[in-house]
A protein has these predicted regions:
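Alpha-helix N-cap/helix-initiation motif
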Residues: 121, 150, 232-233, 260
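Hydrophobic/aromatic ligand-binding patch that stacks against planar heteroaromatic rings
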Residues: 49-51, 160, 242
């Protein structure tokens, strides 16, 4: 039996791509398709510009600049160095598992009436537009809109929003502030002669680091109180100042490898 051919073979230059897992749209220049009909050697079709197609997953082996900003946060897009065979094998395996039905977490909530992006066609605040690493936020007249399919949930937009128009659903600011106050109240009840407490903010990656420090070393000092949040970038100047107002002597942020250091740096400077 002849093997089945349930895929197309094309050649061209991938110019751009939009979308996310399950809904990518790609634009290809110098597009040629292999014609499997006829006798003898297969021939390529006539080249054309601006060819468009849809796909569920993109495995990018071109090298050079990725198609998306913060490409590691774009679901369904796998960019690897084609010269490194183990990385290619790992990416192929990962792509092969992207089958089935997936749920996308809605990380943030917006309240357009509070948005200070623009009024009467006069541009104002663009904090979230400037800081979003994935390009999920776009201008929509007087307001901004967030594409939930592209949003990676870093939380930087909520931390930088001056009006409260964007709130981070996993760790709302009000919840984080209550947790900080509860830590402070608990410490005061048992502190005795211990020095002023210090707050250590971390995520799941930091939790593992703290656990290893306790297992293989001395762990945290007695007056260092850890608090875990979903996304480090969602911890902004308001939360930091709230911690200081509660009685903490200082606030330390334990960065993870994927943390947005630019957004965090802006909030630290503001605080």
């Amino acid at each position: 039996d002849m093997p089945s051919r349930n895929y197309d073979i094309i050649a061209g230059n991938l110019r751009r791509a939009t979308g996310t897992l399950g809904n990518f749209e790609v634009t290809i220049d110098a597009l040629q398709q292999l014609d499997p009909t006829g006798h003898g050697t297969h021939e390529w079709s006539i080249s054309r510009q601006g060819g468009q197609s849809h796909c569920d997953i993109i495995l990018d082996l071109r090298g050079g600049t990725p198609l998306f900003p913060a490409h590691e946060k774009r679901d369904g897009y796998l960019w690897v160095d084609a010269s490194h065979a183990p990385s290619v094998a790992k990416a192929i395996l990962k792509a092969s598992h992207m089958v089935g039905t997936f749920e996308k977490t809605l990380f943030v909530k917006t309240e357009p009436s509070l948005c200070a992006h623009s009024r009467a066609q006069k541009s104002a605040c663009s904090n979230c537009l400037d800081i979003c690493p994935t390009g999920a936020i776009t201008s929509a007249g007087d307001f901004v809109q967030i594409d939930p399919a592209i949003c990676a949930g870093c939380g930087a937009c909520a931390a930088l929003c001056p009006s409260g128009s964007i709130t981070y659903e996993a760790d709302p600011s009000s919840t984080t502030l209550r947790r900080i106050q509860a830590l402070m109240d608990g410490y005061n009840k048992v502190a005795g002669d211990h020095p002023q407490p210090r707050l250590l903010v971390h995520d799941a990656h930091g939790r593992d680091m703290i656990a290893m420090a306790a297992r293989f070393g001395d762990g945290l000092v007695a007056n260092m109180l850890p608090i875990e949040i979903e996304a480090i970038s969602s911890f902004g100047h308001a939360e930091a100042l709230g911690a200081l107002a509660s009685g903490f002597g200082d606030v330390h942020i334990l960065l993870s490898p994927t943390a947005d250091q630019v957004a965090i740096g802006r909030e630290v400077a503001l605080a």
